[in-house]
Amino acid sequence: MAALFIVLEGIDGSGKTTQGDLLLAHFQRQGLAAVLSPEPTNGPVGRLIRQALQGDLFTYNDARQFEAQMGYLFAADRHYHLYHPGDGVEAKLAQQCHVITTRYYFSSLAYNCHTEADWEFVQRLNQSFPQPDWVIYLDLPVDLALQRLGDRQQLEDQAPRECYEQREKLISVHRNYDRIFAHYQGQLCRLDASLPVEQLHQAIITKVEEML
């Protein structure tokens, strides 16, 4: 059985990290080799991305220039994520280790695109990257996502939201995800992310068992 490359996608607050952790634990209970490998990574470019999203790194004030800048950074980090000789996705798959990633190039299309020119630009940056075996899209209404983000902010001592965790931005991102997955030709599982955590986990497990 070949190792699987599974991508969890969704807007901020949709539960990708939680479900990624639960899926990793499921694989481990089954005695299967697996890693959870999120984007952005903890590599050098990934750290720059986090600084930019938190406002701690110079970025352009113009929205389109900012998204173009982020598009380049995410693509560079994605290349590192895929092809790092020790911990990269390709290396892990070659070792028969399942790879779960929270976010992939779909996120770049969803977050960094506002016009058709943006779509073409981001697609060019990511066109050489391999397709995942499965995409699990955690679909969540924006209002519920904002509620969850607010709750999380309180738990984290009022840490400021990242620039992508704003209502207007999330509405645009959700719309872009709808566009992406309406035309996606690969293997896709779209799930209701408003379900309780355990119920959503079981739905993911059911789908994963079909993949194996």
Curated annotation (Swiss-Prot):
Binding site for ATP: 10-17
Record GO biological process: dTDP biosynthetic process; dTTP biosynthetic process; dUDP biosynthetic process
Gene Ontology terms: cellular component: cytoplasm; cytosol
Pfam family, one: Thymidylate_kin
Keyword Flavoprotein: no
Keywords: ATP-binding, Kinase, Nucleotide biosynthesis, Nucleotide-binding, Transferase
EC nos: 2.7.4.9
Gene3D superfamilies named in the record: P-loop containing nucleotide triphosphate hydrolases
Keyword set includes Nucleotide-binding: yes
InterPro entries (alphabetical): P-loop_NTPase, Thymidylate_kin-like_dom, Thymidylate_kin_CS, Thymidylate_kinase
A GO term for molecular function: ATP binding
Catalysed reactions listed for this entry: dTMP + ATP = dTDP + ADP
CDD domains: TMPK
Matching PANTHER family: THYMIDYLATE KINASE, UMP-CMP KINASE 2, MITOCHONDRIAL
Similarity field: Belongs to the thymidylate kinase family.
Role: Phosphorylation of dTMP to form dTDP in both de novo and salvage pathways of dTTP synthesis.
NCBIfam families for the chain: DTMP_kinase
HAMAP family per UniProt: Thymidylate_kinase
Name of the featured protein: Thymidylate kinase
Organism: Synechocystis sp. (strain ATCC 27184 / PCC 6803 / Kazusa)
Name of the gene encoding the protein in the UniProt record: tmk
